[in-house]
Design a protein with these regions (language model features):
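Extended, highly charged alpha-helical segments
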Residues: 122, 127-167
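Short gly/ser/thr-rich secondary-structure transition/capping motifs
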Residues: 52-54, 80-85, 183-188
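G-domain G4 guanine-recognition motif of GTPases
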Residues: 73, 105-108, 140, 152, ...
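Single conserved hydrophobic/aromatic residue that forms the stacking wall/gate
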Residues: 205-215
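C-terminal-of-GTPase-core extension/linker across diverse P-loop GTPases
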Residues: 3-8, 13, 19, 148-204
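Conserved G1/Walker A P-loop phosphate-binding module
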Residues: 1-77, 88, 94, 100
Length: 215
């Protein structure tokens, strides 16, 4: 069983460095924005002591552990949802993952550039969160437009989808990410097909050690 986790954040905050630490991939991590363009991927076995014990009991010919596929995704910038900094391409890479590891820079070092020329972790978090939310709004607006064209068919499922989409659009418009919007299990099941980025589980990782190479 494999699980896909995207490593995201602003440019030059330590995403590739974290990716290297997790995967031992040794990919390029340089002190300039957009060091990464095409996503890097690495698969890591998940340690599980239970698997070791089961192996001793069952003695199978082969043991296949669960794995996590980490994806080092190029940095997003303000305006990414409008295509800034190849944003649409990078957002598409995030959409293909099942979870997000959001890397935030928390260290001062004049030798390591910051895309906004200042260290403000809270603002950096808000920029990424807002770009994911804006991307989801665009996705749902397109879905809404498409469903409205089919509404004359009288299909009840279309009305349910439109109602759920509207609920999420209202929340997203307030700056609330999809995973924090108050909804029930039926809503989640209906909205899943649209693969909203801000609905994915998100882990916040702070990069607080200023090594010489962060990207």
């Amino acid at each position: 069983m494999s699980f896909k986790c995207g490593i995201v954040g602003l440019p030059n905050v330590g995403k590739s460095t974290l990716f290297n630490a997790l995967t031992s991939a040794g990919i390029q991590a340089e002190n300039f924005p957009f060091c990464t363009i095409d996503p890097n991927t690495g698969i890591v076995n998940v340690p599980d002591k239970r698997l070791i014990q089961l192996k001793k009991i069952v003695n199978p010919e082969k043991v296949i552990p669960a794995t996590v596929e980490f994806v080092d995704i190029a940095g997003l910038v303000s305006g990414a949802s409008r295509g800034e900094g190849l944003g649409n391409k990078f957002l598409g890479h995030i959409r293909e993952t099942q979870a997000i590891a959001h890397v935030v820079r928390c260290f001062e070092n004049q030798k390591i550039t910051h895309v906004n020329d200042k260290i403000d972790p809270l603002e950096d978090i808000e920029i990424i969160e807002m770009e994911l939310i804006l991307s989801d709004i665009e996705t749902l607006e397109k879905a809404k437009e498409s469903l409205n064209k089919k509404i004359k068919s009288g299909d009840k499922s279309i009305f349910l989808k439109l109602e759920t989409i509207e609920k999420f659009l209202i929340g997203l418009a307030k700056g609330i990410n999809a995973r924090s919007i108050d909804c029930n299990e039926d809503d989640i099941n209906l909205i899943k097909e649209f693969n909203l980025i801000s609905l994915k589980p998100c882990l916040l990782y702070t990069s607080d050690a200023a090594d010489d190479d962060h990207c």
